[in-house]
Amino acid sequence: MIAVTTPEILPLLHPLIGQLATAILSHWENYLDLSPFELPEGLGYVEGRLEGEKLIIENRCYQTPQFRKMHLELAKLGNGLDILHCVMFPRPEYPLPMFGCDIVSGKAGISAAIVDLSPTSGDKTLPSAYNQALAALPGADFAQARDLPPWGHIFSQYCLFIRPETAAEERQFLQRVTDFLTIHCKCARESQPLSGEEARIYLQGQRDYCSQQQKNDKTRRVLEKAFGWEWAERYMTGVLFDLPD
Protein backbone atom coordinates (compact mmCIF):
# COMPACT_ATOMS: atom_id res chain seq x y z
CA MET A 1 0.00 0.00 0.00
CA ILE A 2 1.25 3.48 -0.85
CA ALA A 3 0.48 6.92 0.53
CA VAL A 4 -1.14 9.58 -1.63
CA THR A 5 0.71 12.81 -2.37
CA THR A 6 -0.81 16.28 -2.34
CA PRO A 7 -0.98 17.95 -5.78
CA GLU A 8 1.29 20.98 -6.07
CA ILE A 9 -1.35 23.30 -7.54
CA LEU A 10 -3.95 22.51 -4.88
CA PRO A 11 -3.40 25.77 -2.88
CA LEU A 12 -3.96 27.82 -6.05
CA LEU A 13 -7.44 26.46 -6.76
CA HIS A 14 -10.95 27.41 -5.63
CA PRO A 15 -11.44 26.37 -1.96
CA LEU A 16 -14.21 23.88 -2.78
CA ILE A 17 -11.99 22.19 -5.36
CA GLY A 18 -9.25 21.94 -2.76
CA GLN A 19 -11.63 20.46 -0.20
CA LEU A 20 -13.00 17.95 -2.71
CA ALA A 21 -9.57 16.87 -3.92
CA THR A 22 -8.46 16.35 -0.33
CA ALA A 23 -11.61 14.34 0.45
CA ILE A 24 -11.20 12.15 -2.64
CA LEU A 25 -7.55 11.36 -1.94
CA SER A 26 -8.31 10.74 1.74
CA HIS A 27 -11.08 8.26 0.92
CA TRP A 28 -8.83 6.41 -1.50
CA GLU A 29 -6.04 6.17 1.06
CA ASN A 30 -8.26 5.20 4.00
CA TYR A 31 -10.58 2.70 2.32
CA LEU A 32 -8.60 1.09 -0.49
CA ASP A 33 -5.33 -0.76 -1.05
CA LEU A 34 -3.54 1.61 -3.42
CA SER A 35 -0.72 0.91 -5.82
CA PRO A 36 0.81 3.22 -8.45
CA PHE A 37 -0.75 3.68 -11.89
CA GLU A 38 1.61 4.83 -14.62
CA LEU A 39 0.23 7.46 -16.97
CA PRO A 40 1.56 7.80 -20.51
CA GLU A 41 4.94 9.55 -20.51
CA GLY A 42 4.77 13.31 -20.14
CA LEU A 43 1.10 13.47 -19.16
CA GLY A 44 1.30 13.49 -15.37
CA TYR A 45 2.05 17.22 -15.16
CA VAL A 46 1.55 19.46 -18.18
CA GLU A 47 1.95 23.18 -18.85
CA GLY A 48 0.77 25.08 -21.91
CA ARG A 49 -0.72 28.39 -22.98
CA LEU A 50 -4.25 29.20 -24.06
CA GLU A 51 -5.15 32.64 -25.39
CA GLY A 52 -2.12 34.14 -23.66
CA GLU A 53 -2.76 32.56 -20.27
CA LYS A 54 -0.85 29.76 -18.58
CA LEU A 55 -2.60 26.39 -18.41
CA ILE A 56 -1.47 23.85 -15.79
CA ILE A 57 -2.78 20.28 -15.61
CA GLU A 58 -1.75 17.99 -12.74
CA ASN A 59 -2.85 14.37 -12.49
CA ARG A 60 -2.88 11.80 -9.70
CA CYS A 61 -3.54 8.15 -10.61
CA TYR A 62 -3.70 4.96 -8.58
CA GLN A 63 -5.05 1.42 -8.93
CA THR A 64 -6.43 -1.17 -6.52
CA PRO A 65 -7.62 -4.78 -6.74
CA GLN A 66 -11.12 -3.48 -7.59
CA PHE A 67 -10.21 -0.45 -9.76
CA ARG A 68 -8.00 -0.51 -12.83
CA LYS A 69 -7.51 3.26 -12.60
CA MET A 70 -8.55 6.00 -10.18
CA HIS A 71 -7.85 9.37 -11.75
CA LEU A 72 -7.89 12.83 -10.20
CA GLU A 73 -7.13 15.74 -12.52
CA LEU A 74 -6.68 19.34 -11.36
CA ALA A 75 -6.30 22.17 -13.85
CA LYS A 76 -5.82 25.93 -13.72
CA LEU A 77 -6.02 28.45 -16.57
CA GLY A 78 -4.60 31.84 -15.60
CA ASN A 79 -6.64 33.45 -12.83
CA GLY A 80 -10.01 32.73 -14.43
CA LEU A 81 -10.63 28.98 -14.58
CA ASP A 82 -10.14 26.13 -12.09
CA ILE A 83 -11.17 22.53 -12.82
CA LEU A 84 -11.46 19.28 -10.88
CA HIS A 85 -12.11 16.05 -12.74
CA CYS A 86 -12.26 12.63 -11.10
CA VAL A 87 -13.24 9.17 -12.35
CA MET A 88 -12.84 5.76 -10.71
CA PHE A 89 -12.65 3.04 -13.39
CA PRO A 90 -13.56 -0.44 -12.05
CA ARG A 91 -11.76 -3.52 -13.25
CA PRO A 92 -14.23 -5.12 -15.68
CA GLU A 93 -14.57 -8.27 -13.58
CA TYR A 94 -16.03 -6.25 -10.69
CA PRO A 95 -19.75 -5.32 -10.97
CA LEU A 96 -19.24 -1.71 -9.90
CA PRO A 97 -20.54 1.61 -11.25
CA MET A 98 -18.37 4.50 -12.43
CA PHE A 99 -17.77 7.21 -9.83
CA GLY A 100 -17.39 10.57 -11.54
CA CYS A 101 -17.10 14.12 -10.24
CA ASP A 102 -16.37 17.39 -12.05
CA ILE A 103 -16.25 21.01 -10.92
CA VAL A 104 -15.66 24.11 -13.03
CA SER A 105 -14.94 27.42 -11.31
CA GLY A 106 -14.58 30.79 -13.05
CA LYS A 107 -14.16 34.38 -11.94
CA ALA A 108 -17.86 34.52 -11.00
CA GLY A 109 -17.62 31.37 -8.88
CA ILE A 110 -18.52 27.76 -9.54
CA SER A 111 -20.49 27.39 -12.77
CA ALA A 112 -20.90 23.60 -12.74
CA ALA A 113 -20.61 20.79 -10.21
CA ILE A 114 -21.57 17.20 -10.97
CA VAL A 115 -21.24 13.89 -9.15
CA ASP A 116 -22.65 10.48 -9.99
CA LEU A 117 -22.32 6.74 -9.63
CA SER A 118 -23.08 5.68 -13.20
CA PRO A 119 -24.25 2.10 -13.85
CA THR A 120 -22.27 -0.28 -16.06
CA SER A 121 -24.66 -3.24 -15.88
CA GLY A 122 -26.47 -4.60 -18.90
CA ASP A 123 -29.79 -3.12 -17.80
CA LYS A 124 -28.17 0.20 -16.78
CA THR A 125 -29.24 -0.07 -13.14
CA LEU A 126 -27.14 0.19 -10.01
CA PRO A 127 -26.51 -2.83 -7.75
CA SER A 128 -29.05 -3.18 -4.94
CA ALA A 129 -26.48 -2.30 -2.26
CA TYR A 130 -25.90 1.06 -3.96
CA ASN A 131 -29.61 1.75 -4.43
CA GLN A 132 -30.32 1.09 -0.77
CA ALA A 133 -27.46 3.26 0.48
CA LEU A 134 -28.09 6.14 -1.93
CA ALA A 135 -31.84 6.16 -1.31
CA ALA A 136 -31.15 6.47 2.43
CA LEU A 137 -29.14 9.69 2.04
CA PRO A 138 -30.79 12.95 3.17
CA GLY A 139 -32.51 14.94 0.46
CA ALA A 140 -30.39 17.46 -1.44
CA ASP A 141 -31.92 20.88 -2.10
CA PHE A 142 -30.18 23.20 -4.57
CA ALA A 143 -31.62 26.35 -6.14
CA GLN A 144 -30.10 25.91 -9.59
CA ALA A 145 -30.00 22.51 -11.30
CA ARG A 146 -28.09 22.14 -14.57
CA ASP A 147 -29.25 20.28 -17.68
CA LEU A 148 -27.40 17.10 -18.54
CA PRO A 149 -25.57 16.92 -21.91
CA PRO A 150 -27.17 15.05 -24.85
CA TRP A 151 -25.21 11.92 -23.89
CA GLY A 152 -26.41 12.17 -20.27
CA HIS A 153 -28.27 8.85 -20.44
CA ILE A 154 -25.13 7.24 -19.02
CA PHE A 155 -25.84 8.80 -15.61
CA SER A 156 -27.92 7.30 -12.80
CA GLN A 157 -31.09 8.62 -11.20
CA TYR A 158 -28.93 9.88 -8.33
CA CYS A 159 -26.80 12.13 -10.53
CA LEU A 160 -26.43 15.62 -9.05
CA PHE A 161 -25.59 18.39 -11.54
CA ILE A 162 -25.90 21.88 -10.13
CA ARG A 163 -24.55 25.40 -9.95
CA PRO A 164 -24.11 26.15 -6.23
CA GLU A 165 -25.22 29.67 -5.38
CA THR A 166 -24.14 29.94 -1.74
CA ALA A 167 -21.43 28.69 0.59
CA ALA A 168 -24.07 26.47 2.22
CA GLU A 169 -24.81 24.84 -1.14
CA GLU A 170 -21.09 24.31 -1.71
CA ARG A 171 -20.85 22.53 1.66
CA GLN A 172 -23.91 20.45 0.80
CA PHE A 173 -22.34 19.40 -2.50
CA LEU A 174 -19.09 18.49 -0.75
CA GLN A 175 -21.06 16.34 1.70
CA ARG A 176 -22.90 14.60 -1.13
CA VAL A 177 -19.63 13.77 -2.87
CA THR A 178 -18.12 12.35 0.31
CA ASP A 179 -21.30 10.31 0.89
CA PHE A 180 -21.04 8.87 -2.63
CA LEU A 181 -17.35 8.10 -2.11
CA THR A 182 -17.94 6.36 1.21
CA ILE A 183 -20.71 4.20 -0.26
CA HIS A 184 -18.62 3.39 -3.32
CA CYS A 185 -15.46 2.46 -1.45
CA LYS A 186 -17.33 0.29 1.06
CA CYS A 187 -19.27 -1.54 -1.66
CA ALA A 188 -16.10 -2.02 -3.69
CA ARG A 189 -14.30 -3.66 -0.78
CA GLU A 190 -17.18 -6.13 -0.38
CA SER A 191 -17.56 -6.82 -4.10
CA GLN A 192 -16.63 -10.21 -5.53
CA PRO A 193 -15.18 -10.63 -9.05
CA LEU A 194 -17.26 -12.05 -11.87
CA SER A 195 -16.15 -14.34 -14.64
CA GLY A 196 -17.07 -15.15 -18.22
CA GLU A 197 -20.11 -13.54 -19.82
CA GLU A 198 -21.08 -11.48 -16.75
CA ALA A 199 -17.69 -9.76 -16.72
CA ARG A 200 -17.97 -9.02 -20.46
CA ILE A 201 -21.30 -7.26 -19.86
CA TYR A 202 -19.71 -4.87 -17.34
CA LEU A 203 -16.73 -4.39 -19.65
CA GLN A 204 -19.10 -3.25 -22.39
CA GLY A 205 -20.88 -0.95 -19.95
CA GLN A 206 -17.60 0.73 -19.09
CA ARG A 207 -16.69 1.06 -22.76
CA ASP A 208 -20.05 2.74 -23.44
CA TYR A 209 -19.45 5.18 -20.57
CA CYS A 210 -15.97 6.11 -21.82
CA SER A 211 -17.12 6.44 -25.44
CA GLN A 212 -19.90 8.83 -24.47
CA GLN A 213 -17.62 10.92 -22.24
CA GLN A 214 -15.15 11.29 -25.10
CA LYS A 215 -17.89 13.29 -26.86
CA ASN A 216 -17.38 16.19 -24.43
CA ASP A 217 -16.64 18.88 -27.01
CA LYS A 218 -15.90 21.62 -24.47
CA THR A 219 -13.01 19.68 -22.92
CA ARG A 220 -11.64 18.66 -26.31
CA ARG A 221 -11.74 22.24 -27.68
CA VAL A 222 -9.80 23.62 -24.71
CA LEU A 223 -7.12 20.94 -25.04
CA GLU A 224 -6.87 21.38 -28.82
CA LYS A 225 -6.40 25.15 -28.52
CA ALA A 226 -3.67 24.75 -25.89
CA PHE A 227 -1.79 21.70 -27.17
CA GLY A 228 -3.02 20.83 -30.68
CA TRP A 229 -5.38 18.18 -32.05
CA GLU A 230 -3.00 15.22 -31.84
CA TRP A 231 -2.09 15.88 -28.20
CA ALA A 232 -5.74 16.48 -27.25
CA GLU A 233 -6.79 13.20 -28.84
CA ARG A 234 -4.01 11.34 -27.01
CA TYR A 235 -5.02 12.92 -23.71
CA MET A 236 -8.77 12.35 -24.15
CA THR A 237 -8.39 8.69 -25.13
CA GLY A 238 -5.27 7.79 -23.13
CA VAL A 239 -5.74 9.68 -19.86
CA LEU A 240 -9.27 11.00 -19.36
CA PHE A 241 -11.36 8.15 -20.77
CA ASP A 242 -9.19 5.28 -21.95
CA LEU A 243 -11.15 2.24 -23.04
CA PRO A 244 -10.45 -0.99 -21.12
CA ASP A 245 -9.06 -3.99 -22.98
UniProtKB/Swiss-Prot annotation:
GO MF, one annotated term: phycocyanobilin:ferredoxin oxidoreductase activity
Entry's family note: Belongs to the HY2 family.
Protein name listed in UniProt: Phycocyanobilin:ferredoxin oxidoreductase
Taxonomic lineage of the native organism: Bacteria, Bacillati, Cyanobacteriota, Cyanophyceae, Oscillatoriophycideae
GO biological process, one term: phytochromobilin biosynthetic process
Annotated function: Catalyzes the four-electron reduction of biliverdin IX-alpha (2-electron reduction at both the A and D rings); the reaction proceeds via an isolatable 2-electron intermediate, 181,182-dihydrobiliverdin.
InterPro entries with a match to the protein in the record: Ferredoxin-dep_bilin_Rdtase, Ferredoxin_bilin_OxRdtase
NCBIfam families: PRK02816.1
Keywords: Oxidoreductase
EC number(s) stated in the UniProt entry for this protein: 1.3.7.5
Catalyzed reactions per annotation: (2R,3Z)-phycocyanobilin + 4 oxidized [2Fe-2S]-[ferredoxin] = biliverdin IXalpha + 4 reduced [2Fe-2S]-[ferredoxin] + 4 H(+)
PANTHER family (alphabetical): PHYTOCHROMOBILIN:FERREDOXIN OXIDOREDUCTASE, CHLOROPLASTIC
Enzyme class: oxidoreductase
Organism, as annotated: Microcystis aeruginosa (strain NIES-843 / IAM M-2473)
